[in-house]
Swiss-Prot record:
Function per UniProt: Part of the ABC transporter complex EgtUV involved in the uptake of ergothioneine (EGT), a natural low-molecular weight (LMW) thiol antioxidant which protects H.pylori against bleach stress. Responsible for energy coupling to the transport system.
Binding site for ATP: 37-44
Protein name per UniProt: Ergothioneine transport ATP-binding protein EgtV
Domain of life: Bacteria
Any Pfam family the entry gives: ABC_tran
Reactions catalysed: ergothioneine(out) + ATP + H2O = ergothioneine(in) + ADP + phosphate + H(+)
Listed GO CC annotations: plasma membrane
One BP annotation, GO: amino acid transport
UniProt record similarity statement: Belongs to the ABC transporter superfamily.
Keyword Oxidoreductase belongs to the record: no
UniProt domain ABC transporter: residue ranges: 5-212
Primary location recorded for the protein, binned into one broad class: membrane
Amino acid sequence: MKEIVTIENVSFNYRNRAVFKDFNLSIEKGDFLCVLGESGSGKSTLLGLILGLLKPSLGSVKIFNETLSNNAFLRQKIGYIAQGNSLFSHLNALQNMTFCLNLQGINKQAAQKEAKALALKMGLDESLMDKFPNELSGGQAQRVGIIRGIIHKPELILLDEPFSALDSFNRKNLQDLIKEIHQNSCATFIMVTHDEEEAQKLATKTLEIKALK
């Protein structure tokens, strides 16, 4: 299988504390990897390294066999869903959802149609489309963020505790939708979670990270 993410001999320190040392990881096309571990073990740091937001002190991180730094083309192939409300405060819900499609030059009407269809699947009423992030509940904002992260059909999707702000009903609906997207596409998923039951439901592979001593 084609390797989508390759991490080789990576070391990374944060505030003089070793988070990773000689860390290796290979993620293949179509994998759904759930990363488990206690708070502070380095789960979100791993996503930061893969996204190119953090640079290892040693070793290499490659996405699609290339380094991500300043590679706009590669970035279009990645979707990222952050923990909590990470929406652009100056854009309304619909504008947030269509942001990545706009960057790709997709027709505005087509982009909005796609966003509204996904919003309906996620239980977001059309009356919310004109609301700004500070007017949305935590669960509504999280669902808008999930749509923004998947709407452009990225080949690699990274999720950091994506269901944390949701009630049990919406959590199950969105888990089912994410599972459906994974099953019906060739996309590769990497999801950080502390919930082992959630990992068992979604993952094809799991990785437990422990804090270095």
